[in-house]
């Protein structure tokens, strides 16, 4: 009979050890995360500050940046604190919080990316009807639905995962609490939960991904009909980069949540999880925003305003 551990805590074994190579990787990862937080925060600031960006497309981008910032903040602070202090314990409640927020934000982002693909389809394929096809009311509904559907998935995963009894040393070979990893420690039959989670993943991952591919397929068909070679190249480059980032994000999610149990590897899980929780949030603002000419112009205007304000403050200080 398997012994059940009565301690309320779990132990996160982490992503890094204390070798020189891993210390360098840890510092590089922190730099990546800080860059990601800064770039996403800047995106939200610009969209809020510049009235020219007060359009559905940029509102969706601001929500994507907010989700990315929250996704990074859910996992990295705890991971960094564990590595620096050596205290790798996490309470059952803390584990539940991570399990809730990861599907909430990851699932919400899946639906939000589908909404953004629809927005691009409406703008490219039906530019004259765009205000009707992508009204503010529809934009807000899609955004709210993305958050609520993600939260529903997160709540179900957190409640179901923490309802199982856990055995052994409560050691989680990961750097944060994730449902597919945690249920491996359960000393109970988890097959019903795993089947339910697979069905959820079909709805949360494959359905939005199919909608995105369909939208970009229609966009590509419209792009090929453009008369201007330069416009065609620009649109194709933009669409291909969007599809590449979307494919990486969904691919990581499908690999983590829909892979057969017999093919699971803790090392692979950690690498893929690090990618979609830390590196994808950095790629999103770079691909969706920084390459956008309107965002670049907004950034120039904002920097110019900051310089002028600083100059005025210096002049006022000198006149005293």
Swiss-Prot record:
**Subcellular location(s) per record:** Cell membrane
Q: Name one GO cellular component term.
A: plasma membrane
For this UniProt entry, which segments traverse the membrane? 24-47, 56-77, 99-118, 138-156, 194-217, 235-257, 271-290
Q: Which organism is it from?
A: Homo sapiens (Human)
Side Extracellular, residues: 1-23, 78-98, 157-193, 258-270
Stored Pfam families: 7tm_4
Q: Using the record, list the residue span of the signal peptide; answer none if the entry has no such feature.
A: none
Cysteines joined through disulfide linkages: 95-187
- Residue positions with a glycan: 17
Q: Which residues lie on this side of the membrane: Cytoplasmic?
A: 48-55, 119-137, 218-234, 291-320
**GO MF entries:** G protein-coupled receptor activity; olfactory receptor activity
By sequence similarity, the record places it as follows: Belongs to the G-protein coupled receptor 1 family.
Chief localization:
membrane
Report which gene this protein is encoded by: OR2T12
How is this protein situated with respect to the membrane? Multi-pass membrane protein
Family annotation (InterPro entries): GPCR_Rhodpsn, GPCR_Rhodpsn_7TM, Olfact_rcpt
Q: Name one GO biological process term.
A: detection of chemical stimulus involved in sensory perception of smell
Q: Tell me the function of this protein.
A: Odorant receptor.
Q: What is this protein called?
A: Olfactory receptor 2T12
Task: Cite the entry's keywords alphabetically.
Answer: Cell membrane, Disulfide bond, G-protein coupled receptor, Glycoprotein, Membrane, Olfaction, Receptor, Sensory transduction, Transducer, Transmembrane, Transmembrane helix
